[in-house]
Amino acid sequence: MTDVALIDAGGANLGSVRYALERLGVEARVVRDAAGLQGAQRVILPGVGAAPEVMSRLRAQGLVAPLRELQVPLIGICLGMQLLFEHSEEGDVECLGLLPGIVRHMTPALGIRVPHMGWNRLVPMRESALLAGLPERASAYFVHGYAAPVTADTVAACDHGGLFTAIVQNGLRCGAQFHPERSADTGARILHNFLEMSFP
């Protein structure tokens, strides 16, 4: 069985992510320090809340450098995905810098509410095993007020007043802006793909 490390960065969605993994037959280990990453074959960084507070917690746990040096597949979920980028406008905070790009505040407009909350369609941008088995026009559940730009690493985007990155992958580093644990079959499939796919 795959050894999965689930990082406890203080997010309220930790339990629901763990339960989503259990439904896939995976018993994840909850990790709160660098030692807990040893032996992991997959690492999951969930997150809700504010980027400065979660980055501060990761620093206090001694996890920033180990995450930057990680040599096994990593997926960030929601805020966890945003933290994979270089910087966030939320609190003007330096993030992990594993992916190029700056996370910016979403701009409200007529008919466009911020935070972005609810179901929205995924727009595939390039091929990736993360999308294997997803139906056309698959939708996922989003709750966020900041978003990462579309880059060459974007696997799928979403449109809410403009396109932003919904799924990202660069080598071993992956991310989902939406909540897979709240996205029914779509979320379960993406978690399954992350756990089972081959990485370069």
Curated annotation (Swiss-Prot):
GO terms for biological process: L-histidine biosynthetic process. It holds the Pfam family GATase. Residues 3-200 form the Glutamine amidotransferase type-1 domain. PROSITE patterns: GATASE_TYPE_1. Pathway: Amino-acid biosynthesis; L-histidine biosynthesis; L-histidine from 5-phospho-alpha-D-ribose 1-diphosphate: step 5/9. Its main location: cytoplasm. NCBIfam families: IMP_synth_hisH. This is Imidazole glycerol phosphate synthase subunit HisH. It comes from Xanthomonas oryzae pv. oryzae (strain KACC10331 / KXO85).
